[in-house]
């Protein structure tokens, strides 16, 4: 992989800057935007970026840091899903707590925001409390967002219980946007000043990158990633007025800044040290870029990937038509097209050939996979296995220099699995999934040295790019994700079935 980002330089610069900021206060509430762990978007657009950079940064500061996790009650009620992992936000909170503990980081508590006694939320609270995790319930803030006098009073932030903390840096994070991180920080700020403590607020958000140009593909890729939130990158006019310097921020932060500044000034009783929303941030990611051209190309590929993702989400009914069109428009404005993703044309051309050969209207799934050396392989779905499984087998054969004619998995292993699916479990689709084929391959590897060699090549697939001519099942997507393969899909279902396509 060509590197465009210096991870070590970034970690050094970022930790130094956070410590400089905390020196001004007894306690700093640091709102962490984006993903704390497994930031796959940042990894894709900044080749060389460590997907767990933020948590490694916190680990470096662990003696000074404790963590509060926010979760909006409404997201629990409607089972909101974290797209990159296919798990609900409440389950992601449990995963996040485990991961943070794995890095020796102290999780102070979980805050349920905009709580109003929702039944599913109460069950989740019980689950946490019975495992020894502190939970705080914050109701919707009275007067928010415009009535500053009510917000900063005992009727507003004062109604929220105060979260007891002991360390100088309190990181406030969440599974996703709209979880109430900012409100939790400001509520704590209110309580700190009522207690005579000097506390501060800052924001750590990786994107948009304030010190790269507005129309840089890196910042446009952020717009593409948040197309459902309707985020738009803008020049921070407050920053320009204060310092006569251009900085990039996004519409929500710029629009909310005047009110946010007034709230902070009302809480502290003095003029805010922040002249702009950019001032509030502590992000130094732009200083880690070492090859701008590599970052630009990676960001363009991400814009195409996001357009495919949004098209599939529209087909599934997850996003509206406006979101779908906006993702496509962003791609076109950058003079990009779907076919600029190298794996798209080989997959579509092979699928068209198969359709012509079969002389049927049925769709056949073809998956194209680009390997690290630039080789593009394809795999097709059959009665025996899915296209995802076929292309993975072809890839490990390629890396192991195994002839295409050699079967890696014995029919003695395959037939009982297919019979189990069809006859015992009553499955409508007996073709083996990618995960099932990999399990079968691992069984064969115990007695077949060739299969064992092929198994050893699976780690080489990490970072590869793939494209499917049909929408993959959640299970198939997750298997590719575990292998470290970035996959896109054409927004077409494999059949007319409504339930059996999921």
Swiss-Prot record:
NCBIfam families attached to this UniProt entry: PRK13663.1
A Pfam family this chain is assigned to: DUF1846_C
Transmembrane portions of the chain: none
Lineage: Bacteria, Bacillati, Bacillota, Clostridia, Eubacteriales
Family: Belongs to the UPF0371 family.
Domain of life per record: Bacteria
Listed InterPro entries: DUF1846, DUF1846_C, DUF1846_N
HAMAP family, per database record: UPF0371
Name of the protein described by the UniProt record: UPF0371 protein CLM_0396
